[in-house]
Amino acid sequence: MPAKQRTAKVNRNPDLIRGVGKYSRSQMYHKRGLWAIKAKNGGVFPRHDAKSKVDAPVEKPPKFYPAEDVKKPLPNRRTAKPAKLRASITPGTVLIILAGRFKGKRVVFLKQLASGLLLVTGPFKINGVPLRRVNQAYVIGTSTKVDISGVTLDKFDDKYFGKVAEKKKKKTEGEFFEAEKEEKKEIPQGKKDDQKAVDAALIKAIEAVPELKTYLGARFSLKQGMKPHELVF
């Protein structure tokens, strides 16, 4: 492809001598067609307003940038959505706990808390399971029901089960080397009274159904030859 030839720009008003043009200002006015532009715009030359200056930033950007790219933290747009309760779990349903300290125990479901966890109890007097929160992923709902209409559950929420943060005390040199047994944490008397009140109302309803007390006291386990997917709970 041949290279384009550059054409020299021709001055429309060549200099006769340095600083003196061939044509006067009035001649160039007509030669350049400025009169036509002025007539087209109502006898006034078109005016272009100057662009507004961009406001200078309050803080100057840094002169130097870090050698390694610093990752910018992404905004957290996650929102807490209430967990949907399984259709097989309704207030009063007897559940089987599958994991944790009380695995295999049968408990009575009382209500779902705002966090999505299930509020359950043994009752404590029958199988030793106190009022506690359980994730519904670790329970099996059975077809057995208990009437819990006489149980008052207004005071039980997620804050009720929250632990009070205790300040750790610095041990002295003597206490550090002494092998002392840790003191057992005592349960507040108020929580003990709440457990007794719930147990009393539940046991009254449980004793009205024959064999239900024995059923709740027995631990669930699989024996040889039993197929979990074929069991009807």
UniProtKB/Swiss-Prot annotation:
Keyword terms:
Ribonucleoprotein, Ribosomal protein
Q: GO CC terms on record? A: cytosolic large ribosomal subunit; cytosolic ribosome; mitochondrion; nucleolus
- Listed Basic and acidic residues bias regions: 48-72
Q: Does the keyword Nuclease apply?
A: no
In the UniProt record, does the keyword Cell membrane occur?
Answer: no
- A GO MF term: mRNA binding
| InterPro entries assigned to the protein according to its UniProt record, in alphabetical order | 60S_ribosomal_eL6 (IPR000915), Rib_uL2_dom2 (IPR014722), Ribosomal_eL6_KOW (IPR041997), Ribosomal_uL6_N (IPR005568), Translation_prot_SH3-like_sf (IPR008991)
Q: Where is the signal peptide?
A: none
Instruction: Give the start-end ranges of region Disordered.
Output: 48-82
Q: Which GO terms describe its biological process?
A: translation
What's this protein's family per the entry? Answer: Belongs to the eukaryotic ribosomal protein eL6 family.
Q: PANTHER family in the record, alphabetically?
A: 60S RIBOSOMAL PROTEIN L6 (PTHR10715), LARGE RIBOSOMAL SUBUNIT PROTEIN EL6X-RELATED (PTHR10715:SF10)
- What this protein is called in its record is Large ribosomal subunit protein eL6y
Q: Which organism is it from?
A: Arabidopsis thaliana
